[in-house]
């Protein structure tokens, strides 16, 4: 699992179109810009507690995390039921869906192809952080 720090320089404003775009037939009247959004402010709430991790595998596709995505993990967030967390279970780091009922914690895969994840009562669980967002490059930049 590759973990990356975050280097923030100047803001990165990106134009935001005024209207949402349908996934069907496009409207030529919807091409004006409403405002600009700074991707750093949108994706990173607490910089000192945030890092990036490259996703490996397909166990979390039901939560929108795909192989080779970059997960944005925030250590300052307290996990809530249904959150995707980066966790260390008995020395093995992975992403799981978090559930807590009283003092009992359960972790789950988000892919029906995987069997249920059984957390033994003696398991040592350390939450590294909550996945607050992810980056899914649809097309990788060509490097030469």
Residue ranges with predicted function:
Residues 63-66:
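A short glycine-leucine-enriched loop at secondary-structure breakpoints
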Residues 68-69, 83:
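Structural motif
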Residues 76-79, 91-93:
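Short, charged beta-turn/beta-strand-edge "cap" motif at the junction between a beta-strand
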Residues 83-85, 95-100:
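Short beta-strand-centered aromatic/proline hotspots
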Residues 106-112:
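Catalytic Cys-His active-site segments of thiol-dependent hydrolases/isopeptidases
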């Amino acid at each position: 699992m590759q973990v990356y720090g975050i280097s923030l320089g100047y803001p990165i404003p990106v134009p935001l179109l005024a209207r949402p775009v349908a996934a069907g037939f496009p409207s030529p009247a919807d091409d004006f810009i409403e405002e600009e959004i700074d991707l750093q402010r949108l994706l990173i709430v607490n910089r000192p507690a945030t890092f990036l991790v490259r996703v490996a595998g397909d166990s979390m596709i039901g939560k929108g995390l795909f192989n080779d995505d970059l997960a944005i993990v925030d250590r300052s967030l307290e996990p809530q039921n249904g959150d995707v967390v980066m966790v260390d279970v008995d020395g093995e780091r992975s992403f799981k869906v978090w559930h807590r009922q009283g003092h009992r914690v359960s972790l789950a895969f988000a892919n029906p192809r995987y069997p249920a994840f059984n957390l033994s009562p003696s398991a040592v669980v350390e939450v590294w952080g909550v996945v607050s967002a992810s980056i899914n490059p649809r097309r990788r930049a060509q490097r030469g």
